[in-house]
Regions:
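Ligand-binding face of N-terminal immunoglobulin V-set domains in extracellular IgSF glycoproteins
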Residues: 107-137
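Bacterial Sec-dependent N-terminal signal peptides
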Residues: 1-20
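Contiguous beta-strand segments within globular domains
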Residues: 25-72, 169-180, 293-306
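Basic K/R-rich, polyanion-interacting modules in nucleoproteins and related proteins
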Residues: 264-314, 399-408
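Low-complexity, Pro/Ser/Thr- and charge-rich linker/hinge segments at domain boundaries
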Residues: 150-173, 376-401
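Aromatic-rich carbohydrate-binding modules that target alpha-glucans
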Residues: 88-113, 204-211, 305-351, 363-391
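Short, compositionally biased P/S/T/A/G/V-rich stretches that sit at domain boundaries
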Residues: 18-47, 153-167, 279-293
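Short acidic/polar inter-strand loop motif in beta-rich domains
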Residues: 75-77, 122, 136-143, 203, ...
Length: 408
């Protein structure tokens, strides 16, 4: 029963942290990027020139026939039941992923798949939330899913962030405020027609839903001095690059061949009692290798062995978090080794640059900065805000505004 509760807790937290999920152990390195901007959340403009590129690997050279299926979702990510597919999709659903290539000269053989939205078979007609399912056509099993957003930017949203918060000044927190102008959208009942979300570094486990506005008028809303828009500053993400299997690269202490696979060891993660600035990517990742040619099919898979020096926590678990963490939740849980006094985890990852952090997930399923990592007001964080709108008589929620700011 205790193990079941632990798995459920991890599942709830880690699934909320990643918009992208893989459900097959053979599917790896799922990534969704808008306009080659691998540092930002997956948000596209409606009827603009934006494109969403989705890639993943299947660990074999046996080509599978995969199809992708799109679903429009409400503001809370439940499927939209009150509109028809023809309302939001121009073209066809359930299309085959036609672009794939086999890996070249890699120890771990894999097939790399790629698709782009929009394309000549489908185009989106409504703003809002979308979920894309990748399905094995032979078994009809869903092997992965990707969540992304489409915004129409019909409302004006302005954001600000400060370290002078309502609970401390230049302490361990940061606070967000924002203002919303309705533009030409008709709003007669704010509680029924407007939904808002604010989050830190694109992490859904930091979502702040429907904060109460500090002021309301016929032109818009203001959200200032709201305590639920106070966030832990946390610490800068850690990082490493595995660019070459013949020698260590940035952040890697050593790399070796064990007779069956490559084993890479990032430097031991020591406690961070004071803040030290280090430019990071807030959990993002980028696939490449030292040759930097055909990275998607020439980069190999290596086992990355994480080691964290921290006092043992007697409640909850320690997990590794990043936008690349799309597999089963237990994959990213660290185990405490009594002999070495370290938390450890080994994860199979593709060569490239990785940004990550350690989180403490308490027994109530809430994630916190790990105590040994610290939480500092100086930490560079990105904040995102989304505003959803439902007009009078409309049957679904539209994403009418999206904004992102960086607090340095």
């Amino acid at each position: 029963m205790k193990r079941f509760a632990l798995v459920l807790m991890l599942s709830l937290v880690l699934q909320s942290q990643a918009e992208n999920r893989t459900y097959s152990p053979q599917v790896k390195t799922l990534q969704a990027v808008v306009n080659k901007d691998w540092l930002s959340p997956t948000v596209m403009r409606l009827y603009g020139n934006d494109f969403l590129n989705i890639t993943f690997d299947e660990l074999s050279h046996d080509s599978h026939r995969y199809i992708y299926r799109l679903e429009h979702c409400e503001a809370d990510w439940t499927g939209s039941e009150d509109i028809f597919e023809a309302d939001w999709l121009e073209g066809f659903n359930d299309n085959v992923i036609e672009k794939f290539e086999h890996s070249i000269n890699t120890v771990v053989p894999y097939t790399h798949y790629q698709l782009q939205i929009p394309n000549d078979r489908c185009r989106l007609k409504l703003s809002g939330n979308y979920r894309l399912y990748i399905i094995d056509d032979d078994t009809n099993e869903t092997v992965a899913s990707v969540e992304f957003m489409v915004t129409e930017q019909t409302m004006l949203l302005s954001m600000a962030a400060t370290t002078n918060t309502d609970i401390d000044v230049n302490g361990s927190h940061q606070q967000v405020s924002f203002k919303l102008s309705y533009g030409d959208c008709q709003v007669t009942d704010v509680s029924e027609q407007i939904q808002t979300i604010v989050m830190q570094n694109g992490r859904e486990d930091t979502w702040r839903w429907n904060t109460r506005p500090s002021s309301v008028n016929h032109k818009g809303l203001a959200f200032e001095h709201r305590r639920d828009l106070i966030f832990d500053g946390g610490n800068e993400y850690r990082k490493f690059e595995v660019l070459d299997t013949s020698h260590p690269t940035m952040g890697i202490e050593r790399i070796r061949w064990d007779g069956a696979a490559w084993q890479a060891y990032p430097f031991l993660s020591e406690p961070r009692p004071v803040y030290i600035y280090d430019e990071d990517a807030n959990g993002s990742f980028y696939i490449r290798n030292s040759d930097n040619r055909d990275n998607d099919i020439t980069s190999d898979y290596v086992w990355v062995n994480y080691r964290l020096k921290a006092p043992r926590l007697h409640e909850g678990v320690v997990v590794i978090e990043g936008r690349w963490a799309t597999e089963e939740p237990e994959t990213y849980q660290m185990n405490y080794d009594e002999t070495s006094g370290l938390y450890t985890a080994s994860i199979l990852q593709k060569q490239g640059y990785y940004s990550y952090q350690y989180l403490w997930v308490t027994d109530d399923g809430v994630s916190h900065p790990l105590p040994s990592e610290g939480s500092y007001y100086e930490t560079e964080n990105r904040y995102q805000a989304m505003v959803y709108y439902k007009g009078t008589g409309e049957r679904t929620w539209h994403l009418t505004s999206y904004a992102q700011i960086t607090l340095r």
